[in-house]
Amino acid sequence: MAAFALLFVAPSCESDDTDFSQIIADHDTVSIRNIQFNDAEVEDSAEQIPTDIADEYFDDYIENQDLNRVVNIAFNGEDATVSGDLTRCRILRNGAHLTVYITGKKVYLKVSGSTRNGSIKVYGENKFGIELCNASIHNPHGAAINSQNKKRMYVVLAEGSRNVISDGADYIDTEGEAQKATIFSEGKIIVSGKGMLQVDAQARAGIASDDYVRLRPGVHTQIISHGTHCIRANDGVMIDGGVHNLETFGNAARGIRCEAFVKMKSGRTTVITHGASVIEDIDTTGAAAVKADSIVVVSGGELRLKSTGEGGKGINAADYVQTGGTVMVVTLGENGLSSPKGVKSDSRITIEGGSFYSYSVNSYAIEGTLVLKPGAKKHLTAKRYHIVEY
């Protein structure tokens, strides 16, 4: 087993029992990196689609499904037309607000057209697909796409399409039902395809799942949230590739918020937060680009994070592990109710490969027990920055 060097960094103390000959503590040698949205294409790493039905994630891949019962939904202003195979679903219409009752397997909704007062709500007990083909759906009073189905929802972005999904500031809730985001599902959300998904969230999160969210290679997303988080999930967020630009303006809001883990394999994800800290009950909570209750793992790709608000953090997790890829974190906020940090871990910040950069203008770049695999080509550290390159 390879030896690792440990360095504990916290606001109250610093101790280093290892000879880091490469450490340079000169602020003038390090500049604040510019982090902004980048829509350019990225070369994703090769995707390994499971072929063994016993694989834990076999069903996450639409290629392993046979969703051949195609239902066409075309929005047209205050109305919508429905055609195709309706043998395994029933659709009720109220203007451009559609309620889909899935009664059998293999249902695949193909959605096109535009509405400023419409939505799709899905009930059922079977996984289903929803392909967005240059669709524009705005629901002024709730989620634009709302799956009350606890099975997987495969969101497919048609190749070359640009899809705009948005909510309004005034939600009307149904008793006993959740609608936590502009795109919400009680089950897993798997996003794939070679198109663009733009989500404009006014009141609640952009995309939310009561299970987990997976973003597959080739997907382009832009999620702007004015109220709360951009992506929210209970059981995991997996970024397998693609280009993702997330920005949130809400106080104590997070770009990516997960009650379990966040894992990034490939692609480029940029997250910018602007919100300040708030007091909830007796606890103080602040904004963060990425917040995970368990672990954040980066094995590849490019993760670019910036928090500008008071007390905002780049990464806030119980544990952080990086084995590859490029991570850049900048926090610009002032100290206030909460203290800004580049990367904050309740346990360890383990870096075994790739490139790591964290800069905090007004506080510590990292907080936690730093564990470095030997062999780094560069290691620069001071209170406000920390850089490691392999």
Each language-model region and where it sits:
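C-terminal motif of bacterial Sec signal peptides marking the signal peptidase cleavage site
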Residues: 9-12
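A composition-driven surface/loop motif
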Residues: 14-390
